Amino acid sequence: PYIFGTQPGRKPVWVFLVQYIRSMKLATFYPRGGTTMVTVTQVAQAVAGAVERNRGGNCYPIGWYNMRWKELLAIIQRYLGVPGRKIITIPDWMFTLAGKRLRKQQQAHHIDGGLNLAKLADIQCAELFIDKSLGCEPLGVLPDDMEKAIGESIKLCVDVMEKRVETVGMRGE
């Protein structure tokens, strides 16, 4: 699942997505598909619920809001000040080609991104949704304001990119 919201002092993982969306001036190009999402508050509730309610070695899929990419991108674009910018769904093969190109660029610079971006298309172009009744509800997770959490994440991404705030990145740099 995608997690939105902010953690004081930490760089959001979504900076790359904001950079990508900002780089496209006339329209946003993105594949079909979508995923499940939770807020940072809901993650904390799920962890607490697992500690307090779980009996035995159970695994719980955590997801509350199932959203297609077009919906997510429309929210992000609103927080970036470009509401209503056209979102164009690209074919899966085009996403695969872009992944192959990026992988070659990474290899040329001796970078191992950790993902085979060409093979990521099968996942990225699917609707990877989770029913909240399978994990969140049994653990006592409550509804939260997903759009607000996305907005907070995007605002912090912009602040990081424009160097208005200092944060620690994912690698602890």
Predicted feature residues:
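A conserved pocket-lining segment of Rossmann-fold NAD(P)-dependent short-chain dehydrogenase/reductase
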Residues: 17-38, 46
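Loop-centered beta-sheet repeat module
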Residues: 7-12, 21-24
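Short aromatic/basic micro-patch
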Residues: 34-37, 66, 129-130
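Mobile cap/lid helix-loop segments that border enzyme active or cofactor-binding sites
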Residues: 98, 115-127
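Mid/C-terminal beta-alpha module of Rossmann-like enzyme folds, strongest
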Residues: 44-114, 132, 140-173
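Conserved beta-loop-beta element that borders a ligand/cofactor-binding pocket
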Residues: 1-7
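Short, hinge-like loop/turn segments at secondary-structure boundaries
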Residues: 13-17, 104-106
